[in-house]
Amino acid sequence: MYFLYLRKYAVLPCKTDTFKLLRQHFMIRIKVFIQLLIIAPLLCSVVMAQKSIYKPYKIAATEKKEGIITGADQTELYIDYLKGKNIGMVINQTSVIGKSLTLSLDSLLKLGITIKKIYGPEHGFRGDASNGADVSNSIDAKSGLPVISIYGNKHYKPTPGDLKGIDLMIYDIQDVGARFYTYLSTLQYVMEACAENNIELMILDRPNPNGFYVDGPVLDTINHSFVGMNAIPIIHGLTTAEYAQMLNGEGWLKNHVQCKLNIVKVANYSHSSAYTLPVNPSPNLNTDKSILLYPSVCLFEGTTLSLGRGTMRPFLQIGHPALQGKYTYSFKPVSIKGMSEAPPQKDKVCYGINLENYNTNNISSSNQLNLAWLIELYNAFPDKEHFFNAYFTKLAGTTELRKQIEAGKSEEEIRASWEPALSNYKNMRVKYLLYP
């Protein structure tokens, strides 16, 4: 209406200079006004275009990332869901985000998320406790949050009191893909506790560095322990979230309860993807090679031999003082705080094999764990009656492997005995895969 009013009076004939000036003045204003009407939509479109680029900031940031992106690192996918909830976090030193390796806890606190409690697994929340050491409850110095140990004094499962006031639990821990790595058991107990207390569990999934193959004897549940709770092989070939789905799907939680899961998948990942862990998953797994050899070498924890604990190269050397004269390679385990205070064969020179130069491509080409070292060193050991200890059966998941080695069975014969249980597991596994 204003535009019409101006136009109506601006075009009136003018007989005086005053009216001419007024007319010119009005005409100039009309031209400016018309130009603004034409240009304004264009300006708006530019502004809107800029907003469309920068408004979804977090999505744009994610798209710039290349390669494998962990669930935790995709904050834009779950941050809104966390707002307004009281959060508990099952985390440790591996729970990091981005190239800066910021702890996911610290990142979420900075984003204004309400974290109420931290739950720490084996090796503790900061990952500085030795293998098997009891870890006590504490207060995190940086955040001031209570840290509840779920690996200490047989306290593996969060109690209703531990979970009081928690609306949502987050599980964000790096696994290495071996049945006897205890974070799997921690996950199971956390899922049971959440299911029993009607708490949803969000899993920020991470790659499995040994996820490219499945191998080993399937656990006989008669040998159920914290280093093996269910009928899966030593190398299970699952990520944490995939295993969580299996726990639900196979009814393996106590009383067959079902845990409500909310999974944030790993982006750009397949089971054949090579993955270097940004942080050591535990004090004695401090190299890519040790992580790849861990499923094979950890069986020596069930023997009298040293596998390098008490050195800076654990899981990369195996030996014993009694093997002097049969092997020239030697090493000496000592007490190392935060890694192994009381390692097997402490302060003794051990003779055996050096795996430092072992080509791990042998694993990816064969898709098999190595039994040859176990058979070789058993045969070389002079006191065979004391080679194995009771822990070996828990690690192997079966009484048969020890009997087979003692009976002189070949690796081929031993592997044949793992069927059909191993094939049945592989078929079952397919149902729970989230990645190709």
Pin down the residues of each PLM region.
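Glycine-rich, charge-decorated loop segments at or immediately adjacent to ligand/cofactor-binding or catalytic sites
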Residues: R126-G132, M202-H224
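Short internal beta-strands
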Residues: T114-H123, L204
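Glycine/threonine-rich flexible loop motifs
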Residues: D175-L187
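Glycine-rich, aromatic-lined ligand/substrate-binding cores of catalytic
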Residues: A267-K346
